[in-house]
Amino acid sequence: MATFIFSRGNIFFYVNKITIPDLMSDVLLSKLSTELADLDGEIGQIDQQISQLRRKKSELTQKRQAIERKIELKTNEDSDVVTDRWDRDGFPWSDEATKILKEQFHLEKFRPLQRAAINAVMSKEDAVVILSTGGGKSLCYQLPALLANGLALVVSPLISLVEDQILQLRSLGIDSSSLNANTSKEEAKRVEDAITNKDSKFRLLYVTPEKLAKSKKMMNKLEKSLSVGFLKLIAIDEVHCCSQWGHDFRTDYSFLNVLKRQFKGVPILGLTATATSNVLDDVKDMLGIQAALTFRAGFNRSNLKYKVVQKPGSEDECTEEIAKTIKRDFAGQTGIIYCLSRNDCEKVAKALKSHGIKAKHYHAYMEPVDRSGAHQGWISGKIQVIVATVAFGMGIDKPNVRFVIHHSLPKSIENYYQESGRAGRDGQPATCILYYRLADIFKQSSMVQQERTGIQNLYNMVRYAADSSTCRRVKLAEHFEEAWEPSWCQKQCDTCENGNGFVGTSSKESTDVSEAAKTTVRIIEEHLNSAKDGSGRITGNKLVELLTKKLKGSRNREFCEKLIVNLLLEGYLQEDFHYTVYSVISYVVIGSKWRVYNGKDAIKMRHVEESKSRKRKASSSVEEEDVMVLD
């Protein structure tokens, strides 16, 4: 641009004149800006692709590591070979062990893996025992205490379970006790003196992890016990609680990593009903027992029949259906119903009573005398059904439980396996029924979202419940990394009974749900944009309601629920949690996978055939918000 000056009389004029080079400069600048914007767009797309590739690489790396771990375990030593080496007679103490088993515990023979674990710890080997619920884990440390004529320290998270075991041991003439906040000064003094006396007849001391972590006096007494040669074994019950990758991590278990260093030469025995390879490796690392022997029982309980039932839309319908099932299939037989909350327990128990079923609720907020009364009434048979939270079950010794019903979705496959495993301990046929619907996912996710692997564990449970085409035992075997063929199930699950139990997806029709998925995302976007401040978030239940209306005539509510579950599990949608003063609310938002979705590739979902039992009127109203109230 150039400036010209000319005058007319005494007046001077300044004129700006645009030159050709100036015009060229503006055009060039505009062109460069356009190119820059295009490059930014391409870079953004590449960033998204890189992000997607990184996630894919992470998934493949995890799969590779899992396969490598399996190869390593198989190469080093087959678990059956390890078990065979230890699960036999011929050890110096074998005859005495059998004698104690029969004369002290009044048992005729060892259960699977009990003898192997006993022989290992008597040989001063560290070991981890994975035995299903009711498999007899407690004998693995109780008998060695008597066999070694010394002290077994038992770390257990539940005082109630500890007290039950102590009563049982004392009835067998075995001196044992616990040290906790309820222990009298006289009893505490007696125990402390006993565990530091090598000639004492005291055999088992039960403590919680908190007790060890907070009591220097306790640790000092145990060191003295070791110095006089009296401490023979440290057993850690529910050892999966050590792992942050587990389904029930407890921070107080972190202190236990000092035990191996502090009590050198004392074998550590970890016990649990469930543990994946990841959890098992983490537990061993945390406790410093990387070379520990592993004794793992197979996951399969052949006498248990697994079923998943579409949960009715209203609570009244649900309890009515449960009552009908109990009356029709389990008349006069003992059972457990697990609920998510204490409120649910009380409501379900009350509803069952109205149907003439002898039921009683059980949860941690009851007075101890009421809780004990419910427990004893159920054990004695006066109460047919106990309706409980997860507070009920650990250490329960009732072999003739014929059914376990889950009123709501458990938080992990491990929890489900352990809780359902309380059925049929006598080896006779028993049934495990899981009632499942979309709303339960959001109630449970609001509770577990702060746990390190809470959502991951929950979604694994959802995959089990939502898959109506794969053998239930195949799903369990995959999770616990065991080999399983659907034919071995013998129609002992609902999918195999219906002829659907297969492995893979190729043999079952899949439906292209791309358009329905796009409609789902549009609803979320419209809801979000409807609020000027961007606060128009949508809950899962509301999304189902709107999607069902949108697809009215072509798809029913059941399809919409299954679609949303599928999109959540595949990462096209995700949950977003928000806190209020009294609750945690789950909202459904667009997931990372949708952000890189090109809109062309087909999104497929396995075909759903609506069964007669599912052709019920589902409530279209949002009966329960996706909210978990904070107590």
Curated annotation (Swiss-Prot):
Keyword Metal-binding belongs to the record: yes
Coiled coil: none
Biological processes, Gene Ontology terms: DNA replication; double-strand break repair via homologous recombination
Key words of the record: ATP-binding, DNA-binding, Helicase, Hydrolase, Isomerase, Metal-binding, Nucleotide-binding, Nucleus, Zinc
Binding residue positions for ATP: L131, S132, T133, G134, G135, G136, K137, S138
GO MF term list: 3'-5' DNA helicase activity; ATP binding; ATP hydrolysis activity; DNA binding; four-way junction helicase activity; metal ion binding
Subcellular location: Nucleus
Residues that coordinate or bind Zn(2+): C471, C489, C493, C496
GO (cellular component) term, any one: nucleus
InterPro entries for the chain: DEAD/DEAH_box_helicase_dom (IPR011545), DNA_helicase_ATP-dep_RecQ (IPR004589), Helicase_ATP-bd (IPR014001), Helicase_C-like (IPR001650), P-loop_NTPase (IPR027417), RecQ_Zn-bd (IPR032284), Rhodanese-like_dom (IPR001763), WH-like_DNA-bd_sf (IPR036388)
Catalytic activity, reaction form: Couples ATP hydrolysis with the unwinding of duplex DNA by translocating in the 3'-5' direction; ATP + H2O = ADP + phosphate + H(+)
Chief site of localization: nucleus
Cystine pairs: none
CDD domains xref list: DEXHc_RecQ1 (cd18015), SF2_C_RecQ (cd18794)
Homology family: Belongs to the helicase family. RecQ subfamily.
Cited PANTHER family: ATP-DEPENDENT DNA HELICASE Q1, DNA HELICASE RECQ FAMILY MEMBER
The protein's name: Putative ATP-dependent DNA helicase Q1
Organism this protein belongs to: Caenorhabditis elegans
Lineage: Eukaryota, Metazoa, Ecdysozoa, Nematoda, Chromadorea
